[in-house]
């Protein structure tokens, strides 16, 4: 429908005045805004990248990863950092828990010599550091480990036993308002790791809650619930964890999908194992009995041998990965069955700890 000529002139004058006052690009038609094309970074897990619908975690946004203890939260964020560094991006790790193991990070592929690391004294200091890094425009990925460890200054200066109702929630709420715009302008990905607490007296529904108030839940573009669902064994020895991640919230694609993968101790996410499974599922890799073949060439007897072959042949692995991504990301209807029936079992966010 054509707009009245006088209205068009008035609109053009108004847009010109806004751009003159606030700068070029302060207002534009949505179709002209090329920054709306979401750039993503791989999570290190192929099935999780596909479950997210965009091929990874979105740049310029806030992401929350939460789950029980020893579920793989920090491992997943370190894999994101490793993937980002491979693309030449600069990463920072805000270690509020004072528990980052550089030796483990190196084993996961993180270049620790070029990883910025801070161990802040207070929650306010941690969030101010995040804001300063985002405003610099020079840092691409920031990880905060964890929201539960972001202790307000008043609580640190007070005594154990003092009541500080809602302090952390107010601190996070103020930080989210300040950070969201700066992250978008600098195209910086900010990942918050969060812990789970139990609500007292819940008779029906899920008693789980995440710490730090409601603001993070609203401002996060992606929320991931990560759980350990089993053990990976070699004979009698436990060598890793079977892990399930649910996409609880997703502003860039359809939510409530899930991915399952293995986290191997000392190695991280078993990417090549996922590649074998998804390759077979999409008929890119042929499986006859225990033998796996690719383009008529046998690559191994048993999944472990096929995985080892792909690890030794990275060019073939990249070729299969590219085909899997093209098949599953270009056509959402062909996505493997990662769906969750509903949002039951998703942790809510409480006002305080």
UniProtKB/Swiss-Prot annotation:
ATP binds at residues 67-74. Residues 339-353 have a biased composition (Acidic residues). The keyword Ribonucleoprotein does not apply. It comes from the Bacteria. Keywords: ATP-binding, Cytoplasm, DNA damage, DNA recombination, DNA repair, DNA-binding, Nucleotide-binding, SOS response. Residues 330-353 are annotated as: Disordered. Its main location: cytoplasm. One of its GO terms (molecular function) is single-stranded DNA binding. One of its GO terms (biological process) is DNA repair. One of its GO terms (cellular component) is cytosol. It is found in: Cytoplasm. Belongs to the RecA family. Can catalyze the hydrolysis of ATP in the presence of single-stranded DNA, the ATP-dependent uptake of single-stranded DNA by duplex DNA, and the ATP-dependent hybridization of homologous single-stranded DNAs. It interacts with LexA causing its activation and leading to its autocatalytic cleavage. This is Protein RecA.
């Amino acid at each position: 429908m054509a707009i009245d000529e006088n209205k068009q002139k008035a609109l053009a004058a108004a847009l010109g005045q806004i751009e003159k006052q606030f700068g070029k690009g302060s207002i534009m038609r949505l179709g002209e805004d090329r920054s709306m094309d979401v750039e993503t970074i791989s999570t290190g897990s192929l099935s999780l990248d596909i479950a997210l619908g965009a091929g990874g975690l979105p740049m310029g946004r806030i992401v929350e990863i939460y789950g029980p203890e020893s579920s793989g939260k920090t491992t997943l964020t370190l894999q994101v950092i490793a993937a980002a560094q491979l693309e030449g991006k600069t990463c920072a790790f805000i270690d509020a828990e004072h528990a980052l193991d550089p030796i483990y990070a190196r084993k996961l592929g993180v270049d620790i010599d070029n990883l910025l690391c801070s161990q802040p004294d207070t929650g306010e200091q941690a969030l101010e550091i995040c804001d300063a890094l985002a405003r610099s425009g020079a840092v691409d990925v920031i990880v905060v480990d964890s929201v539960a460890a972001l202790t307000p200054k008043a609580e640190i200066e007070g005594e154990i036993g003092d009541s500080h109702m809602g302090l952390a929630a107010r601190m996070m709420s103020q930080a989210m308002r300040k950070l969201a715009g700066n992250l978008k302008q600098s195209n910086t990905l900010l990942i918050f790791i969060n812990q789970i607490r139990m609500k007292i007296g819940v008779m029906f529904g899920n008693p789980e809650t995440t710490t730090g108030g409601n603001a993070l839940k609203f401002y996060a573009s992606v929320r991931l619930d990560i759980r350990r669902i089993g053990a990976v064994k070699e004979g009698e020895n436990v060598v890793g964890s079977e892990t399930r991640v649910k996409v609880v919230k997703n502003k860039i694609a359809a939510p409530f999908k899930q991915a399952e993968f293995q986290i191997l101790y000392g190695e991280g996410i078993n990417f090549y194992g996922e590649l074998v499974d998804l390759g077979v599922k999409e008929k890119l890799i042929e499986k006859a009995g225990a033998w796996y073949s690719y383009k008529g060439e046998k690559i191994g007897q048993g999944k472990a041998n096929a995985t080892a072959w792909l690890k030794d042949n990275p060019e073939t692995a990249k070729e299969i990965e590219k085909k899997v991504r093209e098949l599953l990301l270009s056509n959402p209807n062909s996505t493997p069955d990662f769906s969750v029936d509903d949002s039951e079992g998703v942790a809510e966010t409480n006002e305080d700890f």
